[in-house]
Amino acid sequence: MTTIEQLEKHFKIRRNASSIMIKENNAEIFTEEQIKEIMQYCVAEAEKEEIENLHFEISSKSPNYDVYKKYLETYSFEYVTENMIVCKDIYEVEDVESEIDFKLIEEVGEDTFYSLWNEMTEEQVTYDQFVNMMLQEIGEQWKEHCLTASVGEEPIGIVIPHIEKGALEEGKLMYFAVAPNMRNKGYETAFFIGAMFVLKEIGASYYIGEINVQNEWMKDVFEKNGCQLLSSTERYVRKF
């Protein structure tokens, strides 16, 4: 198997105008030589594309952890942060009555959804970059997964529930964001449960979530909704 084939099969790759994120996607065991070739290839591609930052994310439970660490140092990557991975069984999640109203992107309009997404996630990307991210992560049907949440006429958040590519029953929330002025007003739990029910409706039996270890707000949401800690990941970056 070529280096690019290994990357496409065993890693999740996300690109935007200034960076590439390469994330370990399973527990495949590689030889040291294979990992060296993967690192060399990624650095060479980043230099060729003249991007600013190359990110690499590895699991703390990876069978290749020590070798990854060795070659991340060899190729001048610097440690950035740690994320925690949680899991929730959603077989028994039920639709509960709530004042939160979910609407699809076709009901609110693409411009409105994109504006809310920018405001609530604070990610500085163009609309074309946003669409490209959706296509990479979800595919051509991405619009069917983009939801706004409102109470009355007041938008409180956006969420993008979907089934992980290559996994039949693994539910993900590409984004779960609440407007800063609507946080800590008692909406988070009902919003999260509503998102879990949507995942169940589209075929997920469990949810896997990932957040930065310093994100106390989202950690609190996970804890209140019975999510269990699975593992952690470490993120490294090489700047060009």
Q: What annotation goes with each model-predicted range?
A:
Residues 210:
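Long, contiguous binding/interaction regions
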Residues 96-128:
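Short amphipathic alpha-helix that is part of the acyltransferase structural core
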